[in-house]
Every structure is written in structure tokens, then in C-alpha cells.
Curated annotation (Swiss-Prot):
Gene3D superfamilies: P-loop containing nucleotide triphosphate hydrolases. The keyword Coiled coil does not apply. Belongs to the ABC transporter superfamily. Aliphatic sulfonates importer (TC 3.A.1.17.2) family. This is Aliphatic sulfonates import ATP-binding protein SsuB 1. Keywords: ATP-binding, Cell membrane, Membrane, Nucleotide-binding, Translocase, Transport. It is an enzyme of class 7 (translocase). The keyword Lipid metabolism does not apply. It comes from Rhodococcus jostii (strain RHA1). CDD domains: ABC_NrtD_SsuB_transporters. Its EC number is 7.6.2.14. The complex is composed of two ATP-binding proteins (SsuB), two transmembrane proteins (SsuC) and a solute-binding protein (SsuA). It is found in: Cell membrane. The gene is ssuB1.
Length: 245
């Protein structure tokens, strides 16, 4: 996707209620075209709900989501979840092409990009958890989304596979820039991947940390370590506040 066609987002007054429970409180947020933004926060504050609202899978109780930049053809987003959601009765290539037509060559290119060249005829049951998530990433990218929405996509993976997937995502985005929103419980993951890290609590967005470091980032960097401690402290305070309600 050419840099000039990148899409940004404006969230204005987004609020959401489930019956008598409010999970999002008047969220105002501007995401610049091509920006990578991560959301941290305690469970139950609406992080995944916010992604679903941006994707159009849920409607906010109030507020609007608007796109900025790009072309006039509308904004298309794709979500990638913690569960790979592959169809077990379809092979790898068919899973990548799901919902599209005449995309075989592009699907094969993406499987190469994610390190699964030659595995297109395999069944999901023949793949490891990390490999299945690679297929899910290729499937999301095949649709060439303006906005890639990642809901804890690596949360179920072991530590080594998680780092490998983070590095893969970095490489793919370096070659195919796009706007990305990530929900994660892994503070280090957010700091390594993101341009901005937002702390979402029951009070709304209480921290907006901008990371000026170039990528790839060294995980032992002293400044990243200091930010990690700061964010962990904020998460602990937010979790304690929720527990006391």
C-alpha cells in the first residue's frame, strides 16, 4: 500500500454500554495514517470492544468513527484474533483465500512472506500454534486492509514463538505499511512494536505514550525498560481501582 494511500482514524466521543454496564467512556482518539497504536489495560475496560466498533462489528452507544486520508473508496479493516479461526476442513491455501476470488498467486506470495512457502496444501492440524497464526496473518493481509486490527493475536503462544511473530509482523509492515491497532496484555510487546502505547482504564485513556525509537528495537534498551515499569505501575493501579468497585 503506497504511503500516500494510508488511512487514519478519528474516534469522537465513543461510548458503549452492555445493559447496565458502561465499558467505554467518551473515547476521543486520533490515529495518524500508518501509525501503530497499542492498547493496554485491565480486563473488562472495553479494549476488544473498541476494536470491534472500529471494525464495524459492533455499534457504539454514542460517538462516531471516521477515517482520514487514503482514497475516497471507503475504509476496510480486518481483525486478527488470539484464536487463529482456521477452518479445519480447508487446507492452508484455502484458508488464506477464504472470502476472496482469483487470489491464488497473491495468497502464495503471502505464505512465502510469512515463512510458510510449500505448506499451502497442509491441513491446519499439521501446523503448530505459531504457524497457524502465520496463516491467519496472511489471510488478514490478503484483503489489503487499510486498518489492521489485532486482538491479542499472539497471546496464546509460547515466549519464543511470540517474539518470532512480533519480528515477522515488523518485517511485513516494513514492506507493506498500514495503520495498525493492537490490543495486548504484554507491555514489552506494545513497547517493541508501537509508535504509541495507550493505557485504557475505566476512566478512559489515561496514558498516551509516544515511542520515538526507530524499529527494530533492542529489548534491553534502558528507556524502554523505564517505560515498561511506568506502564506496569499504571496497569496495577487501574486493576486495583476496578477491584475496589
Amino acid at each position: 500500500m503506497p504511503a500516500t494511500n494510508l488511512v487514519g482514524l478519528d474516534l469522537v466521543g465513543i461510548g458503549h454500554r452492555y445493559r447496565d454496564t458502561t465499558v467505554l467512556h467518551d473515547i476521543d482518539l486520533t490515529v495518524e495514517p500508518g501509525e501503530f497504536v497499542s492498547f493496554l489495560g485491565p480486563s473488562g475496560v472495553g479494549k476488544s470492544t473498541l476494536l470491534r466498533i472500529i471494525a464495524g462489528l459492533e455499534q457504539p452507544t454514542h460517538g462516531v468513527v471516521e477515517s482520514t486520508g487514503g482514497t475516497s473508496g471507503g475504509t476496510m479493516s480486518r481483525m486478527m484474533f488470539q484464536e487463529d479461526r482456521l477452518l479445519p476442513w480447508r487446507n492452508v491455501l484455502d484458508n488464506v483465500q477464504l472470502g476472496t476470488r482469483h487470489q491464488r498467486e497473491r495468497a502464495l506470495e503471502l505464505l512465502y512472506d510469512v515463512g510458510l512457502a510449500g505448506r499451502e496444501k497442509d491441513w491446519p492440524s499439521e501446523l503448530s500454534g505459531g504457524q497457524r497464526q502465520r496463516v491467519a496473518l496472511a489471510r488478514a493481509l490478503l484483503h489489503q486492509p487499510d486498518v489492521l486490527l489485532l486482538d491479542e493475536p499472539f497471546g496464546a503462544l509460547d515466549a519464543i514463538t511470540r517474539v518470532a511473530m512480533q519480528q515477522l509482523l515488523e518485517r511485513v509492515l516494513a514492506e507493506q505499511p498500514r495503520t495498525v491497532l493492537l490490543v495486548t496484555h504484554d507491555v514489552e510487546e506494545a513497547l517493541v512494536l508501537s509508535d504509541r502505547v495507550l493505557l485504557l482504564t475505566d476512566q478512559g485513556i489515561t496514558r498516551d505514550l509516544r515511542i520515538p525509537h526507530a524499529r527494530p528495537r533492542h529489548r534491553g534498551d534502558a528507556q524502554l525498560a523505564a517505560w515498561k515499569e511506568e506502564l506496569l505501575d499504571g496497569l496495577l493501579q487501574a486493576d486495583n481501582a476496578l477491584s475496589s468497585l
